[in-house]
Each structure stands twice: as structure tokens, then as C-alpha cells.
Amino acid sequence: MLKTDLTAPDCLQEGEMGKKLQAKCLGIISAASCVKLYCCYGVIMVLTVAVVALSVTLSVRKKKPVMESCEPCYAVCSSGWIGFGNKCFYFSEDMGNWTFSQSSCIALDAHLALFDSLEELNFLKRYKGASDHWIGLHRESSEHPWIWTDNTEYNNLVLTRGGGECAYLSNRGIYNSSGDIHKKWICNKPNNYTLQRPLIVNPG
């Protein structure tokens, strides 16, 4: 009985210490849990923002037309024709007078070639080879202005040499002579495709 009375305070003391230790442990665990919880909230917020931003980006890209590059932006021409700028050119292997050459071009839904710039003229000179070629420049007489086969007046971008009524392209420039002489010829027609400019594709 005496032994029991002596140990009772010790037991009470040990019980109080256990409660304090338990509370301390719970506090440590609670603090660690809060840190982990905040970390989880932070990760969730970052992921949510990333998903929203990605969704907005994809939505904008879907609505925006896609521009397909066209480099170089030369005309797309049928077989046997050469594209430059927005035109297609045909360089004949046969020979004929100026009138026959123009008729041959018309049969191909084209006309004897005309040029709008020095770049176009230089392209024709490079590509034609060594032979002279009829082009679409002509006049009624030496008293009349030069006109193209589409009836537009020539702007004298390059002077013609000679005393004839029909012009041809040589390695040295533009010359003219009687239209009865047989030469090769160059036809041209506008490009009928849309690929000479960037193609807009609307996503479905």
C-alpha cells in the first residue's frame, strides 16, 4: 500500500510529460503538413495557369489563317512553260515569221511575249539561248509608235534598233526587221494559278 502511494506522483508526472511530448509531436507534424499543403497548392496553381495559357494559345492559332510561304514567288506553269514573276513563258524550238509566231501563241491561249521591267527582259535574254526570238512588239510603220500584241503602247524602256515593223530579241538587245523573216519566238500568258502569292489556308 505504501509502495503504491509513493509511485502515484511519479505516474502522474510521467503522464503529464507524455501529453506534452504528444502535443509537441503533433505540432511538428501539423507544421510539416501545412508546408506540404502549401507546396501542393502552389504546384496546382502553376499547372492551372499553364493549362489555361496553352488553351488560349491553341485557340488563337486555330482561328488565325495559316500562311504558306511561297518562295520564290514565281508563277506555277504547265509543262513546257517557264515561270517568271506572275507570267508563264514558252520558248519555241520551231521557226516562223512574225505573223505565224503570233498565231502559234494564240493557239496556246497566249500571245507573243511582252516584258514590263528590265528584270523580265534580262530573264528572257538569258533563257532564250543564242537564237533570235520574235517578241510581241510591232508597229504599222516607222511613223507609228511601237505597240504590244495586247494593244498597249510600248514605253521605250529599251530602245529598238533597225528599220522594220516587227521586233525580236537578240543577245545584244531588241532589234526590228521585216516580219517575213523566220525566227524562233517567245509566247507568254498570265499565270492562271494562285500560287504566285501566299496561299491562305483556313483551318477547319
Curated annotation (Swiss-Prot):
Glycan attachment positions: N97
Domain C-type lectin: 84-188
Location relative to the cell: Cell membrane
Protein name: C-type lectin domain family 2 member E
Taxonomic superkingdom: Eukaryota
GO CC field: plasma membrane
Function noted in UniProt: Lectin-type cell surface receptor.
Cytoplasmic side: 1-36
Extracellular side stretches: 60-204
One Pfam family cited in the UniProt record for this chain: Lectin_C
Record field: transmembrane: 37-59
Molecular function GO terms recorded: carbohydrate binding
Lineage: Eukaryota, Metazoa, Chordata, Craniata, Vertebrata
Disulfide pattern: C77-C88, C105-C187
InterPro entries: C-type_lectin-like, C-type_lectin-like/link_sf, C-type_lectin/matrix_domain, CTDL_fold, NKR-like_CTLD
Membrane topology designation: Single-pass type II membrane protein
The entry's keywords: Cell membrane, Disulfide bond, Glycoprotein, Lectin, Membrane, Receptor, Signal-anchor, Transmembrane, Transmembrane helix
